[in-house]
């Protein structure tokens, strides 16, 4: 056979022969073109010359010669194309002709590997393993390169070609990082295109896993591994099943799992994820077990055992560890199985407290819970109650019990009533019962309870008390010969009394009395002798006695005398001694009812002398016999000392020439009157008799200059004394003094008219401002003089004095010298509108300067007057450029001198200058507005860098100029000068030209997706910087940056890929911007990222990617076969991020390329993927009812595969068996565990991919055993059993029951394998039968044989137990019966504080309401109810409530202080209060107070229901207060079981501590001060059931009741209550007579005394208003003036006589009433702004206090005062008209004071002045005033007044609202009165009617503007009208006087005072007219209209 080459040559030869041609031509050709690809070659050549024959032969090293078919392209060109060549191979081409052969060598391109990928199995955290299949064709080597995510080359390698398998591993990489790998095939000098794949290193696992465990949660912590991490995934597995999972970011180092099962073991996996790969670490973790619940330790009444029960906690429990300990010492410890829930401890100590700890153990963890329990205590032994001989006492003794106890509780019973309940310490073995209110002689029962914790055990015994003696044995009365005793009967049993009286050791009387006797009188006794009286109580053979000592009253002395023996300071007395027993004599010296001497004299003495007495005073000497502290009746005699003469006599002429006044110091002692005599030369000129209180007088019409003698005689009784003095009158003064300057500046002439009378000479003095200059003595015959060398312009005072002896008379005159003009008058400075002139001051005195400004001799301004020290003046607001004349006048008094000067103003500068470049780069235009005044022209100049560029002169009518040829962007200084003559005024401004724009702007992306580079050429002119703006294609600004003027480019980074941008450049110079230069540019679009395979199956591949950043237009997607052929392509929207290819071949590798397009730019990414082989089908498993075998079968897999792999898994994931084969369809597994679930995997393998099918099957389980029941409740119980052996598997148990009720089965352990269940929903009390089976499997279950058990439930508890108080001694309880079968209820009621059982009984099941009676008031009780059914008891249900508390029931009238059972002294009353007076039915009485009232004949039976009442200090310092209370003292009645026998001894007025103790004026508190002597008092006892809370804060509304007032009890008189009173009355009458005489003598004088009444608030008046006492006032000023109604009109006419003289005088007397009180709080700086007028302030004592805010001491202030009325001491509140800032305070006061009525008697605005702010809503919309909400409900407008109704409530108490009426009188002028009386009277009556219909309301608020004038008139009229309705007299003066004691200026004007009289007169007239005509006039004034008009003299003003 020929070779291929030889055959080709032969073929060519034969061809040539067949052509039959001659010798062929020679071929000349040249190679034109040659191309080569991987599998083809193309070659072309051209024939040069004539056509010829040729052939083309090609060959390679693996291929012999072959002919390449040629084809003709044109006449001279030929070619040959070869296909299906071997890649990478060198081919030799020969073009053969007959005479020439040309060789061409061509090589095909090599191909890359067909498959190139990353081997995940061999990839680690630091290495990446790549593999590829050999390329087809020839390859000499492969070049493999590794790139990071940013396509930066990391590593590269050249690997020689291998025929089988090619691979390479990159080391030292970063864990968790993505890499791109490129491979290129190299063959000779050619390289294939690169093939890419990507891969990732495995992330590093976490390190140092830490576990923090709790019962329901696990806290996992870890440390980061090396390399990159994207996230951590945590998985908590339970037997291969995911229980919980979570994903956290790469920075996290901890994670918490919640909701876990306590005590459970989990498999924890912490997985690190990065670059699509994972790595993990795992660890076994366990949650902490939970502690048991409902742990209870009970003793069941046992002394020596305890029972412990608990409920199993949820979760897993392995066992329980129970320990019993006492005080930290473990007594016993036990380990119990987890299904046990109770245990018992025995042989314990009685009464001991044990600690029981139950630990739940799960694995290595445990949870503890502790409870305590106590054994029942033992009883005491040998209990006895004995009498110790003491009254009201028993001694209880006993022997201690066995075991432990804490204390004893001792109860004392009187029958069934508990008298004593007390606790004593455990170390005690006896207790003495004292002060427990035991009744003597009575038998009691004692119970001793041993208490240990809350457990008790008791023992009882009986005992009896000793009888009691009588109580409060005292001497009731004693006189000179008799002694009466009285006592109170004790609470005891007795038969009679034995009465005895003894004198020292001698028994005088011994007598038996009946048991009802309470007093006895002993007679025929010796005066002043001491006796012992004894009362003995006899009861059977027992007795007890009580004794009291008493003394008879001693006898009085006789024949008492007193004398002064002519001395001024001594008295002498003597007497005859008294009969009977006398210890001493008490001698008192009394002066003006005050004891000034108190001496005790021996009984043997009968005389005494008094020294150092007051002269002229009348004294009373009292001698009293005293024996044993008892005084006899007093004997009184009077005597007087001689009066003293006066001293300090002063005679004064008072500067008068016809008058002398005489004054002296009052003579010491007492004086009746003085006689003053004036004499001259021994002749009496005048004589006056002066009252003793006056110490001065005067004499007039005397001769000037004469010497007089004054004699003052002191008289007292029949005695007198004398004093002398002399004095002279003042001489007369001159007349008509004249002073003249004669037009000279240094000269004055003085002249006068001669003085009358006698004088020595004249003295003339000239002075200036009290500085003497000259004094001249002038003979009495001359009448003028001259003064020279004086100061110019000075005012001089000239005094002409008449001299006569030591006295003189002055007359003054004034004169002034002429002033001089100013000096150095100069124009100092000038401006456009100012002239500044200065000068030097004129010589001499100058009063002021007057300066004038003239223009053309006309005054420009009015003259200006300057002080005399002024030396300059500036004229302003002048006209610029104008000439002015300035004139300066020197003025001294009424004379003046002048000087002047002339000057000009500066022309004004231009204004409103505006410079603008007008958008040009080379010019500036300036314009301006001319200034004021005249100007000739303007000069405009431009400067650049201080160099003048241009300057122009502009006519005065031109106001604009433009500068040209300037530089762009440059700053210029422009100067504009106003020119006026030689003066200029210029202004400099700055302007800048517009900068030029840059040129040649270009934007380039430099192949970047995130940046653009902008470049430009520099702008012309001056530039500071370039502002470069980056905008969107639509012109939206994205960035704004600046570059220095020297920069020519800028790079924008962090841009959006594929986005088109606009760029603008502005040149900036001095804040000006050039025109923008603009260009456009686009960034390269970004390729997609995170391109990945999301799903691959046997027939399709799904890809997903992350969208390209930035903007893009669309995606092109290509899918290539392994040979590079396109399989499929698609174009998708930019929003698409996934794509799938369907109907692919199984197991094939594909390449997917995605290209991103944006505009004209693009970018791409690619990835490889393979399909999955098919799996088997119909895989099934079956156990065939066996417990140890499983059978599986299936159908074969379709498609290609290599083999099957069978894997059987245990439940824990471990492999049980593993088999491999290709032709299997069934398999059996044997030797398996019963009940266990197995999983079979059948895996189909094909290449590196596989597919599997799984099936599950389970063996049958084993049955349970040993069923039991626990925790049996009413609707639930626990069932436990023993499960199958531990080595078997099972999942659950199935529980069934009969009857088939709808029950709920709960697994409390959260583990289905737990050997117990809790069943809910049971019918209480029902019997059930249960069976249990073992269950294996969840969906397909197998069951074991059942086991059975029966049980019955408890009855249910009651529902909605509600107990509420019925009254103070009963409560009611109701409930809903349980839905259960039951027999009845067991009910107990206990006291909460003592736990004593007060009530216990069984109740039928049909009842659900119970009343419990006979309880203690105001005690909290606990009611417990249990349901009972067939020996089963439900849970106890408890509720507590408190019995009611209320005011104590008012005692009956006979229960009060008995005036017969009191002991009385001059300052105290001793009486007894008994607990039985007040019942505790409505609650225990907690406190008492004593209410004391002066008896005044009123019919009030009980105290006013007001709290608190005034204190003792208020009562003593305010005469209008008649009632006071003592301090509160605690009641101990509730502590005494027999409280009716408890009594309190009260000594009122003795500074008793319990009543408040001694009074301290510095402390405002309740106290117990001494009572007034000889004063009748009525006493009431006030008892409180509620007064203070637990923090001793007083309740706002305490609960109390009062006894009836006692009958009047009169205190004893002072010792001089007999004769002294008579003498005092006589002296009082004499004094009054002397006062009347003195008043007639000095009737024109105003008394110097001023009242100082106390301003305490009055208690409710009980006396008629016509009766006023002068207590608390000095002098004899009246406080009331009651007028009988039938005499009123005549009285009013008398007051109106002589132009209202008497009425004005009466009103004037009220001027200073109350003004002595302090207003310190109102004057504080913080409070001044709260006063409308600074002279109308509230007194501190009567002001209204608001509640404090935020501890601000001034926040309680408001200008308001309490005012008393006829009914209450705080009947009104008077306030000012609210200010804008005090409206909130006003409404706060209304709210806090419980105000229901407001009276307003002013308009808000009067005569244009605001009198009161509008402080209420204008409409019916609600408004806030502070925290209060006010709403107007209605408004009734009448002609003269308006009535509004408001609703007010607190912001936090919207339901607790109050209605308030607002009475607004609208026709009353300020400081005046209404036109008629009818209008106001009717208004007052209307308001009073509303007030009377508002019971329980607080004070009525009344206000005008200041709150004194109209307000006072309204209140006074209201009180007066009430008097007219209820009394026969009216007291207007007293009403106003009372008002002014509480607020200043009440009834402010006299016309208002008269108006009140007119109102009374008109009311009385109308009443009389109504009576006559029987036509009702009041209150509606119908039919009759009398003239209710004011008198004309009091018209409005």
UniProtKB/Swiss-Prot annotation:
Q: Does the keyword Transmembrane apply?
A: yes
- Give the sugar-modified residues: 28, 53, 75, 172, 198, 267, 321, 414, 421, 479, 544, 574, 598, 652, 721, 829, 1040, 1096, 1163, 1185, 1212, 1274, 1367, 1470, 1474, 1518
Summarize the record's induction comment. Up-regulated by hypoxia.
Active site (catalytic residues):
1904
GO CC terms, sorted: plasma membrane; receptor complex; specific granule membrane; tertiary granule membrane
Pfam hit, one: PTP_tm
Q: Which residues form the Fibronectin type-III domain?
A: 23-111, 112-207, 203-288, 291-378, 379-471, 467-552, 556-641, 642-729, 730-829, 819-906, 909-1001, 995-1083, 1087-1175, 1173-1260, 1260-1356, 1357-1448, 1458-1554
Kindly list the residue ranges recorded as spanning the membrane.
1622-1642
Q: Which residues lie on this side of the membrane: Cytoplasmic?
A: 1643-1997
User: Per UniProt, which keywords does this protein have?
Assistant: Angiogenesis, Glycoprotein, Hydrolase, Membrane, Phosphoprotein, Protein phosphatase, Repeat, Signal, Transmembrane, Transmembrane helix
Q: Which CDD domains match?
A: FN3, R-PTPc-B
Known catalysed reaction(s)? Answer: O-phospho-L-tyrosyl-[protein] + H2O = L-tyrosyl-[protein] + phosphate
Residues annotated as binding substrate are 1870, 1904-1910, 1948
Q: What does this protein do?
A: Plays an important role in blood vessel remodeling and angiogenesis. Not necessary for the initial formation of blood vessels, but is essential for their maintenance and remodeling. Can induce dephosphorylation of TEK/TIE2, CDH5/VE-cadherin and KDR/VEGFR-2. Regulates angiopoietin-TIE2 signaling in endothelial cells. Acts as a negative regulator of TIE2, and controls TIE2 driven endothelial cell proliferation, which in turn affects blood vessel remodeling during embryonic development and determines blood vessel size during perinatal growth.
Q: How does it assemble?
A: Monomer. Interacts with TEK. Interacts via fibronectin type-III 17 domain with CDH5. Detected in a complex with CNTN1 and NRCAM. Interacts (phosphorylated form) with FYN and GRB2. Interacts with IGFBP2.
* The family this protein is said to belong to: Belongs to the protein-tyrosine phosphatase family. Receptor class 3 subfamily.
What's the protein name? Receptor-type tyrosine-protein phosphatase beta
Taxonomic source organism: Homo sapiens
């Amino acid at each position: 056979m020929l070779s291929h080459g030889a055959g080709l040559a032969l073929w060519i030869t034969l061809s040539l022969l067949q052509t039959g041609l001659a010798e062929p031509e020679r071929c000349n050709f040249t190679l034109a073109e040659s191309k080569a690809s991987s599998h083809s070659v193309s070659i072309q050549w051209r024939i040069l010359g004539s056509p010829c024959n040729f052939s083309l032969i090609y060959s390679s090293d693996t291929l012999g010669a072959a002919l390449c078919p040629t084809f003709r392209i044109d006449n001279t060109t030929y070619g040959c194309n070869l296909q299906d060549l071997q890649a990478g191979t060198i081919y030799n081409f020969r073009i053969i002709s007959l005479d020439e052969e040309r060789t061409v060598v061509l090589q095909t391109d090599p191909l890359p590997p067909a498959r190139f990928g990353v081997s995940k199995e061999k990839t680690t955290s630091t290495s990446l393993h790549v593999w590829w299949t050999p390329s087809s064709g020839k390859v000499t080597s492969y070049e493999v390169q590794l790139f990071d995510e940013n396509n930066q080359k990391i590593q590269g390698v050249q690997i020689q070609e291998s025929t089988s398998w090619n691979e390479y591993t990159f080391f030292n990489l970063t864990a968790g990082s993505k890499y791109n790998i490129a491979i290129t095939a190299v063959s000779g000098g050619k390289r294939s295109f690169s093939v890419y794949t990507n891969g990732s290193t495995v992330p590093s696992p976490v390190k140092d896993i830490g576990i923090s465990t709790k019962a329901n949660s696990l806290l996992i912590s870890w440390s980061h591994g090396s390399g990159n991490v994207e996230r951590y995934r945590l998985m908590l597995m339970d037997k291969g099943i995911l229980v919980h999972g979570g994903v956290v970011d790469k920075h996290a180092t901890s994670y918490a799992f919640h909701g876990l099962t306590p005590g459970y073991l989990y498999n924890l996996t912490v997985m690190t994820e990065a670059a699509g790969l994972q790595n993990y670490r795992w660890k076994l973790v366990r949650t902490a077990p939970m502690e048991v619940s409902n742990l209870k330790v009970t003793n069941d009444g046992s002394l020596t055992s305890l029972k412990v029960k608990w409920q199993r906690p949820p979760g897993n429990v392995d066992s329980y560890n129970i320990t019993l300990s006492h005080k930290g010492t473990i007594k016993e410890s036990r380990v119990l199985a987890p299904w046990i829930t109770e245990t018992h401890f025995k042989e314990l100590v009685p009464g001991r407290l044990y600690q029981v700890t139950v630990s739940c153990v799960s694995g290595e963890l445990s949870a503890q819970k502790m409870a305590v329990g106590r054994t029942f205590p033992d009883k005491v032994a040998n209990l006895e109650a004995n009498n110790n001989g003491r009254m009201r006492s028993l001694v209880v003794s006993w022997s201690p019990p066995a075991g432990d106890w804490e204390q004893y509780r001792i109860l004392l019973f009187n029958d069934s009533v508990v008298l004593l309940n007390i606790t004593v310490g455990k170390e005690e073995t006896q207790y003495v019962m004292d002060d427990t209110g035991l009744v003597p002689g009575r038998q009691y029962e004692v119970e001793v309870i041993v208490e240990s914790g809350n457990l008790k055990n008791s023992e009882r015994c009986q005992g009896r008390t000793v009888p009691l003696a009588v109580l409060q044995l005292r001497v009731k009365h004693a006189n000179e010969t008799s002694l009466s005793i009285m006592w109170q009967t004790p609470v005891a049993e007795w038969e009679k009394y034995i009465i005895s009286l003894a004198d020292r050791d001698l028994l005088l009387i011994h007598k038996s009395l009946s048991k009802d006797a309470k007093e006895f009188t002993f007679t025929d006794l010796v005066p002043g002798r001491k006796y012992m009286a004894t009362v003995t109580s006899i009861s059977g053979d027992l007795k007890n006695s009580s004794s009291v000592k008493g003394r008879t009253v001693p006898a009085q002395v006789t024949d008492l005398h007193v004398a002064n023996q002519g001395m001024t300071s001594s008295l002498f007395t003597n007497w005859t001694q008294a009969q009977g027993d006398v210890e001493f004599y008490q001698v008192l010296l009394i002066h003006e009812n005050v004891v000034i001497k108190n001496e005790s004299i021996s009984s043997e003495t009968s005389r005494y002398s008094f020294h150092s007495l007051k002269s002229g005073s009348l004294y009373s000497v009292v001698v009293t016999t005293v024996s044993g502290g008892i005084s006899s009746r007093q004997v009184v005699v009077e005597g007087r000392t001689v009066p003293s003469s006066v001293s300090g006599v002063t005679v004064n002429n008072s500067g008068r020439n016809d008058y002398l006044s005489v004054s002296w110091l009052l003579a010491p002692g007492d004086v009746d009157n003085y006689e003053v005599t004036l004499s001259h030369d021994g002749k009496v000129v005048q004589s006056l008799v002066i009252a003793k209180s006056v110490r001065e007088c005067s004499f007039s019409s005397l001769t000037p200059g004469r010497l007089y003698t004054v004699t003052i005689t002191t008289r007292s009784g029949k005695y007198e004394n004398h004093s002398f003095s002399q004095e002279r009158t003042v001489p007369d003064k001159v007349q008509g003094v004249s002073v003249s300057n004669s037009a000279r500046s240094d000269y004055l002439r003085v002249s006068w008219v001669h003085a009358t009378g006698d004088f020595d000479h004249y003295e003339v003095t000239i002075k200036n401002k009290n500085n003497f200059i000259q004094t001249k003595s002038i003979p009495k015959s001359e009448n003028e003089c001259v003064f020279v060398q004086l100061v110019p312009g000075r005012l001089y005072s000239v005094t002409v004095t008449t001299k006569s002896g030591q006295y003189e008379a002055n007359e003054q005159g004034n004169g002034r010298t002429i002033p001089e003009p100013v000096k150095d008058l100069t124009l100092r400075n000038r401006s456009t509108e100012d002239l500044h002139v200065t000068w030097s001051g004129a010589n001499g005195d100058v009063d002021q300067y007057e300066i004038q400004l003239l223009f053309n001799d006309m005054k420009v301004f009015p003259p200006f007057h300057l002080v005399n020290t002024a030396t300059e003046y500036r004229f302003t607001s002048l006209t610029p450029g104008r000439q002015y004349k300035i004139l300066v006048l020197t003025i001294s008094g009424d004379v003046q001198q002048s000087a002047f000067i002339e000057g000009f103003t500066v022309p004004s500068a231009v204004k409103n200058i505006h410079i603008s470049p007008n958008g040009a780069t080379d010019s500036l235009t300036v314009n301006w507005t001319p200034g004021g005044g005249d100007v000739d022209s303007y000069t405009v100049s431009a400067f650049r860098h201080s160099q003048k560029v241009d300057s122009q002169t502009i006519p005065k009518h031109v106001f604009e100029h433009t500068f040209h040829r300037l530089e762009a962007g440059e700053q210029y200084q422009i100067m504009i000068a106003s020119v006026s003559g030689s003066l200029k005024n210029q202004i400099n401004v700055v302007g800048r030209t517009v900068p030029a724009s840059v040129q040649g702007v270009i934007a380039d992306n430099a192949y970047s997706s995130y940046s653009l580079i902008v470049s430009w050429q520099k702008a012309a002119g001056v530039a500071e910087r370039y502002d470069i703006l980056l905008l969107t294609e639509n012109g939206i600004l994205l960035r704004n940056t600046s570059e220095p003027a020297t920069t020519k480019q800028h790079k924008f980074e962090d841009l959006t890929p594929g986005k088109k941008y606009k760029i603008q450049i502005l040149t900036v110079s001095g804040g000006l911007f050039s025109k923008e230069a603009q260009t456009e540019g686009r960034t390269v679009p970004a390729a997609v990222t995170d391109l990945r395979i999301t799903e691959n199956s046997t027939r399709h591949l799904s890809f997903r990617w992350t969208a390209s950043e930035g903007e893009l237009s669309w995606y092109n997607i290509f899918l290539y076969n392994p040979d590079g052929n396109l399989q499929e392509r698609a174009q998708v929207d930019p929003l698409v991020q996934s794509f799938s290819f369907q109907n692919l071949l199984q197991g094939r590798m594909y390449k997917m390329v995605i290209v991103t397009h944006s505009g004209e730019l693009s970018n791409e990414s690619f990835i490889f993927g393979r399909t999955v082989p098919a799996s088997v089908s119909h895989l099934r498993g079956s156990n065939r009812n066996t417990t140890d075998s499983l059978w599986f079968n299936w159908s074969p897999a379709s498609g290609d595969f290599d083999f099957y792999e069978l894997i059987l898994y245990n439940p824990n994931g471990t492999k049980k068996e593993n088999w491999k084969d290709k032709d299997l369809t069934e398999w059996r597994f044997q030797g398996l565990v019963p009940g266990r679930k197995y999983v079979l995997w059948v895996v189909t393998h094909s290449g590196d991919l596989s597919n599997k099918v799984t099936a599950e099957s389970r063996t049958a389980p084993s049955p349970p055993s040993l069923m039991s029941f626990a925790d049996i409740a009413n609707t639930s119980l626990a069932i436990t059993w023993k499960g199958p052996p531990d080595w078997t598997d099972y999942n659950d148990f199935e529980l069934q029951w009969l009857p088939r009720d709808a029950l709920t089965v709960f697994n409390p352990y959260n583990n289905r394998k737990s050997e117990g269940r809790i069943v809910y929903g049971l019918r209480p009390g029902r019997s059930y039968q249960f069976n249990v089976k073992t269950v294996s499997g969840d969906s397909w279950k197998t069951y074991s044989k059942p086991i059975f058990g029966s049980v019955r439930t408890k009855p249910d508890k009651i529902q909605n137990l509600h107990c509420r108080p019925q009254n103070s001694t009963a409560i009611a309880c109701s409930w809903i019966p349980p839905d259960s079968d039951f027999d009845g209820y067991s009910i107990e009621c206990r006291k909460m504080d003592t736990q004593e059982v007060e009530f216990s009984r069984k109740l039928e099941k049909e009842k659900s309401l119970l009343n419990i009676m006979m309880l203690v008031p105001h005690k909290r009780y606990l009611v417990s109810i249990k349901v009972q059914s067939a020996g089963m008891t439900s849970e106890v249900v408890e509720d507590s409530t408190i019995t009611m508390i209320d005011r104590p029931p008012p005692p009956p009238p006979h229960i009060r202080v008995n005036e017969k059972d009191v002991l009385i002294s001059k300052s105290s009353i001793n009486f007894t209060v008994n607990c039985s007076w007040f019942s505790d039915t409505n609650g225990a009485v907690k406190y008492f107070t004593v209410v004391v009232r002066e008896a005044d004949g009123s019919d009030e039976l009980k105290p006013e229901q007001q709290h608190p009442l005034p204190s003792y200090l208020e009562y003593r310092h305010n005469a209008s207060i008649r009632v006071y209370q003592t301090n509160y003292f605690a009641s101990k009645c509730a502590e005494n079981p027999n409280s009716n026998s408890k009594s309190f001894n009260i000594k009122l007025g003795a500074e008793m501590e319990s009543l408040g103790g001694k009074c301290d004026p510095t402390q405002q508190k309740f106290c117990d001060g001494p009572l007034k002597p000889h004063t009748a008092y009525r006493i009431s006892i006030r008892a409180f059931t509620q007064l203070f809370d637990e923090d001793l804060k007083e309740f706002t509304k305490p609960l109390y009741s009062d006894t009836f007032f006692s009958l009047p009890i009169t205190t004893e008189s002072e010792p001089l209550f007999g004769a002294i009173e008579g003498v005092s009355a006589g002296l009082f009458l004499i004094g009054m007579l002397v006062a009347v005489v003195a008043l007639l003598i000095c009737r024109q004088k105003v008394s110097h005394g001023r009242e100082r009444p106390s301003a305490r608030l009055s208690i409710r008046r009980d006396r008629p208003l016509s009766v006023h006492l002068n207590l608390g006032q000095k002098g004899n000023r009246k406080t009331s003036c009651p007028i009988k109604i039938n005499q009123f009109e005549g009285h009013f006419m008398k007051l109106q006589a002589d132009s209202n003289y008497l009425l004005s005088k009466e009103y004037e007397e009220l001027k200073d009433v109350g003004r002595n009180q302090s207003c310190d709080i109102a004057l504080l700086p913080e409070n001044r702004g709260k006063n409308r007028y600074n002279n109308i302030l509230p007194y501190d004592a009567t002001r209204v206090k608001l509640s404090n805010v935020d501890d601000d001491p001034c926040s309680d202030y408001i200008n308001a005062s309490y005012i008393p009325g006829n009914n209450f001491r705080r009947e009104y509140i008077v306030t000012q008209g609210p200010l804008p800032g005090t409206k909130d305070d006003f409404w706060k006061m209304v709210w806090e004071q419980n105000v229901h009525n407001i009276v307003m008697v002013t308009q808000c605005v009067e005569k244009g002045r605001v009198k009161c702010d509008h402080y209420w809503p204008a409409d019916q919309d609600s408004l806030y005033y502070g925290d209060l909400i006010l709403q107007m409900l209605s408004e009734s407008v009448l002609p003269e007044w308006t009535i509004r109704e408001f609703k007010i409530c607190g912001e936090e108490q919207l339901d607790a609202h109050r209605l308030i009426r607002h009475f607004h009188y609208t026709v009353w002028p300020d400081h005046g009165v209404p036109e008629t009386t009818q209008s106001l009277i009717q208004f007052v009556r209307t308001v009073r009617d509303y007030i009377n219909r508002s019971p329980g309301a607080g004070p009525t608020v009344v206000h005008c503007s200041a709150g004194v004038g109209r307000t006072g008139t309204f209140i006074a009229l209201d009180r007066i009208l009430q008097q007219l309705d209820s009394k026969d007299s009216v007291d207007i003066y007293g009403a106003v006087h009372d008002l002014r004691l509480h607020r200043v200026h009440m009834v402010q004007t006299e016309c208002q005072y008269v108006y009140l009289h007119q109102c009374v007169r008109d009311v009385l007239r109308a009443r009389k007219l109504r009576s006559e005509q029987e036509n009702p006039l009041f209150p509606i004034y119908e039919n009759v209209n009398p003239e209710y008009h004011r008198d004309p003299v009091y018209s409005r003003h």
